[in-house]
């Protein structure tokens, strides 16, 4: 594909039957054996994803913690060394620049994991707000490959080829210098599927060997490579948000029900804090809701939500859920129509189909939190 970037794993996709698409400027596999099969593999067994297109940045220096807090809505002070935090990075109006993971290595050393489509924008935003903070910011995206191994059997399989007890890496914790098939990696118990699992950061030159080693280790258990199609249905069922769908620079964390990750009572200031405090006091005018389509059809991103002939919002993500076997979606609607049980219509092509607001936590799976 012309002018598209590739990850260090580009050469292995076809070996496994990967169908390649353009995603965020990268050649990436949308599926291997079919996204339904892959979706169920992750829910029931374990699946391996190439997520090397994600961005990474290091922030180091005396003021690293203070600087990260100035950029992020969550409370960075709660992070201990070798812990991970999910957070938003907002603009002055409270709109979301990105949602990302902050890895704390030490008081003066942080590692940020950035959405692929926002890499350049995020790094520029971070650099532009350095000000007088005593920090060094380095975009390390090109020197890191990232694999995600997700599913109920992920720990059991990965344990065969690592030199540490994976049970010691708790949910949203990390360990550096883990030998995975003899190669030094950073391993965190994190993911984007709603299942237990790990994200593995390695040198680009080690990625192919690790890919083959993990799949070979899980051959008996039925581990499979997974494409972008199933990655999206898995995150959607678990009500994990996607930048560009559920949020963007005009949508705030409060509007999408993620106020828990915007700590408005902390002493420290952060970009967007005043706007979010004001919005919380006044109340949001729109909300992200889950819905089930009652008529036959499939809701898609961008479809209008209609009540009594009036457009009240739009679908952010919609699918026929492979796990629940029904057409469900997320929609950003006017606040007065956001209560569970509210009925409205979704305009699918030229027809208005009946839908009802439901709890947006469509699927929950216990992860290891202890």
UniProtKB/Swiss-Prot annotation:
UniProt keyword list? Aminotransferase, Transferase
Task: Provide an example Pfam family for this protein.
Answer: GCV_T
In terms of superkingdom, the source organism counts as Bacteria
Q: Indicate whether Transferase appears among the record's keywords.
A: yes
A Gene Ontology biological process in which this protein takes part is:
glycine decarboxylation via glycine cleavage system
- The protein's enzyme class: transferase
Q: Which GO terms describe its molecular function?
A: aminomethyltransferase activity; transaminase activity
InterPro entries noted in UniProt: GCS_T (IPR006223), GCS_T_bac (IPR022903), GCST_C (IPR013977), GCV_T_N (IPR006222), GcvT/YgfZ/DmdA (IPR028896), GcvT/YgfZ_C (IPR029043), TrmE/GcvT_dom1 (IPR027266)
Stored HAMAP family? GcvT
UniProt function note: The glycine cleavage system catalyzes the degradation of glycine.
Q: Give the NCBIfam families listed for this entry.
A: gcvT, PRK00389.1
What is the protein's quaternary organization?
Answer: The glycine cleavage system is composed of four proteins: P, T, L and H.
Name of this protein: Aminomethyltransferase
Species the sequence originates in? Clostridium botulinum (strain ATCC 19397 / Type A)
């Amino acid at each position: 594909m012309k002018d598209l970037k590739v990850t260090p794993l580009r050469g292995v996709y076809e070996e496994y039957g990967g169908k390649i698409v353009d995603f965020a400027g990268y050649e990436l596999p949308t599926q291997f054996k079919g996204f339904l099969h892959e979706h169920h593999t992750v829910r029931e067994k374990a699946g391996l994803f190439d997520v090397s297109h994600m961005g990474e940045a290091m922030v180091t220096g005396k003021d690293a913690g203070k600087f990260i807090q100035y950029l992020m809505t969550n409370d960075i002070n709660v992070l201990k060394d070798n812990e991970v935090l999910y957070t938003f990075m907002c603009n002055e109006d409270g709109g979301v620049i990105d949602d990302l993971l902050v890895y704390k290595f030490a008081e003066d050393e942080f590692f940020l994991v950035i959405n692929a489509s926002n890499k350049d924008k995020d790094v520029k935003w971070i650099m532009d707000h350095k000000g007088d903070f005593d920090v060094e910011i380095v975009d390390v995206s090109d020197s890191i490959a990232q694999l995600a191994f997700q599913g109920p059997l992920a720990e059991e399989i990965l344990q065969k080829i690592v030199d540490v007890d994976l049970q010691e890496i708790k949910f949203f914790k990390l360990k550096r210098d883990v030998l995975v098939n003899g190669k030094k990696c950073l391993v965190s118990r994190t993911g984007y599927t709603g299942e237990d699992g790990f994200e593995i950061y390695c040198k680009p030159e080690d990625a192919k060997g690790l890919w083959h080693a993990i799949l070979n280790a899980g051959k008996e258990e039925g581990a499979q490579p997974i494409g972008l199609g199933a990655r999206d249905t898995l995150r959607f069922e678990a009500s994990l948000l996607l930048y560009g769908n559920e949020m963007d620079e005009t949508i705030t964390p409060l509007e999408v029900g993620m106020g828990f990750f915007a700590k408005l009572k902390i002493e420290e200031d952060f970009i967007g804090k005043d706007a979010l405090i004001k919005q919380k006091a006044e109340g949001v005018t729109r909300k992200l809701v889950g819905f089930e389509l009652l008529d036959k059809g499939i809701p898609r991103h961008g479809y209008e939500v209609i009540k009594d002939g009036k457009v009240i919002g739009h679908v952010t993500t919609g699918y026929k859920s492979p796990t629940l076997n029904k057409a469900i979606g997320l929609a950003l609607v006017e606040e007065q129509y956001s209560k569970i049980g509210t009925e409205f219509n979704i305009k699918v092509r030229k027809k208005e189909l009946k839908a009802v607001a439901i709890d947006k936590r469509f699927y929950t799976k216990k992860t290891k939190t202890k």
